[in-house]
């Protein structure tokens, strides 16, 4: 981001407040303007922001804000996972005949098709609607879609309902993590985004658990889909009590509202610290205004794709999303009932809990480690585990399906030991996926500057859903033509390519503020720049801590000296009496 994108900042309010000025170079016209954010006095890190973010605390208000936002993640998970357990229960309720494999694929893909449009539209309009407004619009689509699906008596009706539902899924997938990214304090931002990411597999687990319980219930599939409207209505109610993202409030001119939100997020920070945080956010928002003013949406897209830093950041997060989808993980969710039925399990819906439950557990582990190990750190640990799981699936499916010519045959009873080994491979694969892609893809907003954050998130999430669509509509056909072993071999090859790209092109964002992460792609893909910025931030924080300890030690020493040199009248009288008696009282010595 160039300096010309940023407004002048009046730092006079910082005098004698313990917060340093940022020097302003003169521009060609001789007037002063603030430096590029990458030039804080010759450093990559703004020491004043480090001081402000030292006030990060997890408060009840923050917990409420994150939990209410993460309901969108639960809806995302529930509505994508429910189809895998609901479709086997439909029977002949839609048109008088059982669903064939093509109809199942289209119904399953309906949500994905809607999500492509939802992520593109709500992502592109995220700045104008606001983060809060976009989530509320998504909730409306969730509710309408659930009602249409639950009341369906024909295949076309349920497809329409799934598409409408998908618009809500796509919008929530873009905006919810974006909203959390912009409101969470730096020190806990990873875990806060992780809450939303955890709610996705948690929603899938809930859908599988309810599905297992309604297996023998008449119209149980209708209940499964109808229950999807409950969380969306709850979020509509809770969001009435939540604020807009402070950066959107500044963008819309509500500066006092933005200051209030910052104060609630950083309750122990001084007013001067809050003011400094506000001023820095205001500078970045000026770049958004400069990009959007006087241009159409497509002109902004063209400008964004022509600018190297914007283009690289969007490519990186889009590749991250695509890599996560092209592992083939979601096929285990969408077709869990069908797949585990083919493997001979008596309750396929209960079998679907195996991948969903494993995923939820390891997403929880991953989100608890993400602020310590880092985003790249988890990728470097978890993706190799996932790749080994792919190899396990390739080999185990090959040997299990040998008696049936390499293909899965519903009429054949496979050896229970072989089935157990296959399930073990699936679980091992999901362990690696849960630690990595299952939640790390939703950290995408961290890598995008504010002026392209909504648009870039929309593009990346649209890529996610396109890749999801390709995988979901082709999976059953691949099993029938490429064999299960060949199908997972194909996913293995794509996963290796995606992993190699991310190793070289996805920088680390832990320890960096949301304003600092937007600087990573200025010159290249930012991997080395990230390491340099995080090193400088650690050194800055240590210097501030040492300074605070030094100040505390000095104050303590001065207090002791003051105490030792202060003599009360009683002590003085006792001391003088001792002198008259020819001895010096130690307790009164000075």
UniProtKB/Swiss-Prot annotation:
Induction description: Expressed during infection.
Listed name of the protein: Myo-inositol transporter 3A
Localization (cell): Cell membrane
Gene3D superfamilies listed in its UniProt record: MFS general substrate transporter like domains
Residue intervals annotated with topology Cytoplasmic: 1-57, 127-132, 179-192, 244-325, 371-376, 442-455, 507-590
Keyword terms, alphabetized: Cell membrane, Glycoprotein, Membrane, Transmembrane, Transmembrane helix, Transport
PROSITE patterns attached to this UniProt entry: MFS (PS50850), SUGAR_TRANSPORT_2 (PS00217)
Organism encoding this protein: Cryptococcus neoformans var. grubii serotype A (strain H99 / ATCC 208821 / CBS 10515 / FGSC 9487)
Topological domains annotated Extracellular: 79-105, 154-157, 214-222, 347-349, 398-420, 477-485
Name of the coding gene: ITR3A
Listed transmembrane segments: 58-78, 106-126, 133-153, 158-178, 193-213, 223-243, 326-346, 350-370, 377-397, 421-441, 456-476, 486-506
Gene Ontology molecular-function annotations: myo-inositol transmembrane transporter activity
InterPro entries to which the protein is assigned, alphabetical: MFS_dom (IPR020846), MFS_sugar_transport-like (IPR005828), MFS_trans_sf (IPR036259), Myo-inositol_Transporter (IPR050814), Sugar/inositol_transpt (IPR003663), Sugar_transporter_CS (IPR005829)
């Amino acid at each position: 981001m160039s300096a010309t994108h940023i407004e002048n900042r009046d730092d006079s309010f910082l005098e004698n407040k313990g917060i340093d000025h940022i020097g302003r170079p003169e521009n060609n016209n001789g007037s002063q303007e603030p430096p590029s954010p990458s030039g804080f006095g010759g450093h990559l890190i703004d020491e004043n922001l480090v001081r402000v973010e030292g006030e990060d605390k997890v408060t009840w208000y923050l917990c409420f804000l994150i939990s209410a936002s993460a309901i969108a993640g639960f809806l995302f998970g529930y509505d994508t996972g429910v189809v895998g357990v609901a479709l086997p229960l439909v029977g002949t309720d839609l048109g008088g005949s059982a669903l064939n494999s093509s109809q199942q694929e289209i119904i399953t893909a309906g949500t994905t098709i809607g999500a492509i449009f939802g992520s593109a539209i709500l992502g592109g309009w995220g700045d104008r609607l606001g983060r809060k407004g976009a989530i509320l619009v998504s909730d409306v689509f969730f509710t309408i879609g659930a009602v249409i699906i639950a009341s369906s008596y024909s295949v076309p009706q349920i497809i329409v309902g799934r598409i409408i539902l998908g618009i809500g899924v796509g919008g929530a997938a873009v905006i919810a993590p974006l909203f959390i990214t912009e409101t969470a304090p730096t020190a806990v931002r990873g875990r806060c985004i992780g809450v939303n990411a955890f709610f996705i597999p948690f929603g899938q687990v809930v859908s599988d658990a309810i599905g297992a319980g309604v297996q023998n219930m008449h119209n149980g599939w209708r209940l499964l889909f109808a229950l999807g409207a409950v969380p969306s209505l709850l979020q509509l109610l809770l969001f009435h009590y939540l604020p807009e993202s402070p950066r959107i409030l500044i963008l819309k001119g509500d500066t006092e509202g933005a200051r209030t939100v910052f104060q609630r997020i950083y309750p122990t920070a001084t007013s001067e610290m809050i003011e400094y945080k506000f001023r820095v956010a205001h500078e970045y928002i000026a770049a958004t205004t400069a990009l959007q003013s006087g241009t159409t949406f497509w002109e902004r897209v063209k400008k964004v794709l022509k600018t190297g830093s914007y283009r690289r950041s969007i490519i990186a997060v889009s590749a991250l999303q695509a890599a996560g989808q092209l592992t083939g993980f979601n096929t285990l969710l969408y077709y869990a009932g069908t797949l585990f039925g083919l493997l001979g399990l008596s309750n396929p819906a209960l079998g679907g809990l195996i991948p969903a439950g494993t995923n939820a557990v390891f997403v929880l582990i991953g989100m608890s480690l993400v602020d310590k190990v880092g985003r790249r750190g988890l990728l470097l640990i978890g993706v190799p585990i996932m790749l080994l799981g792919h190899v396990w699936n390739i080999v185990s499916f090959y040997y299990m399906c040998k008696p049936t010519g390499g293909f899965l045959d519903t009429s054949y009873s496979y050896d229970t030991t072989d089935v157990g080994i296959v399930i073990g491979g699936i679980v091992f694969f999901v362990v690696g996926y849960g630690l990595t892609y299952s939640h790390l893809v939703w950290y995408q907003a961290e890598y995008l500057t504010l002026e392209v954050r909504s648009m870039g998130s929309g593009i990346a999430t649209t890529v996610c859903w396109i890749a999801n669509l390709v995988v979901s509509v082709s999976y059953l056909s691949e099993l029938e033509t490429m064999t299960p072993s060949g199908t997972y071999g194909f996913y293995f090859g794509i996963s290796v390519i995606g992993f190699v790209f991310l190793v070289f092109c996805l920088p680390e964002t832990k320890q960096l503020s949301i304003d600092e992460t937007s600087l990573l792609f200025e010159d290249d893909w930012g991997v080395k720049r990230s390491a340099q910025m995080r090193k400088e931030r650690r050194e800055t924080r240590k210097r501030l801590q040492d300074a605070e300890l030094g100040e505390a030690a000095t104050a303590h020493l001065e207090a002791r000296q003051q105490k030792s040199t202060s003599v009360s009248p009683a002590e003085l009288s006792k001391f003088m009496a001792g002198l008259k008696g020819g001895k010096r009282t130690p307790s009164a010595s000075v």
